Each structure stands twice: as C-alpha cells, then as structure tokens.
Amino acid sequence: MNKSSVFILIGGKSKRFGSPKWQAILNDKLILDHIWDACDIFENRFVIGKEKPKYFEKPFIRDALEMNAPINGLYTALKNAQSDWVLFLSCDLPLITPKIFEKLWKSKTDNCDIVIPKANNKTQVTCGFYHKRILPKLESEIQKKHYS
C-alpha cells in the first residue's frame, strides 16, 4: 500500500459537460467511484470541493480558499496532507488505473517535487504526485494571483 494521500477534486463549473462530472455514470457506476476504487492502493483518500454534496459519504475536505481554480484544490490537498507526497486528481479520469499511479510513482527521483504525466504534448497537472515542500512556492504564486 502506498503511504501517499489521494485528493480527488470535484469542482469546476463543468460548463461544456453540462452537469457535475463526478456524478456522471459510466458502466453503471459514478465516475467518482471508478476513480475512488482505482485509488484503493493508497492509505488515505479524500474528496475536495467547494461544498460537500448532499448525501455524500466519502471523506470530504472543503476548499481552503474562496476562488475557482485547480490551484485551490492542490493548495487544500497539501495543507491537509497526512504524508509528504499527495496524489492530486481531477474527477474526470474514470479510466485511470493503479498501474498508471505505480508508473508515475516509480518515475520520481530523489530531488523532484512534482511527478505529472504528459499526454498529447500537454502536462496533466490534475493527475500527479506533489511533495509538501512545494507549499511555500504555491502560497507565493497564489498571493501573486498566478493561478495557472
């Protein structure tokens, strides 16, 4: 079992999608549940969002800041981390597997702080491992209103 904590982000406006992505159904199962189950190799799992949905039973942490940006979720995850490393995921990855997490984890080096995949020449910042030591840099970027 990986000692990292997992934080799944269920926020955003889902403008193009039309409804909250985490509530979408794939193969008779909520997308969030697909991701949650793929993360069962980790010791601690949490969901992060602006407000806890009604009848929500998974461990939930409210966004630490009043802003709409993924950096808020990452900041919240790192502030609440129970381990040095966190796996930060968006809620729109229903096909993610433990093998992908293992591959990412094995690719980290001793001197790295972030491990994120690259797909179609784009970095996937809401699917990666982040070390707690980046928190001061993250706080600095938030103070400067650099949210990307």
Indicate residue ranges for each PLM-predicted region:
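Nucleotide and nucleotide-moiety/phosphate-recognizing core
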Residues: M1-Y147
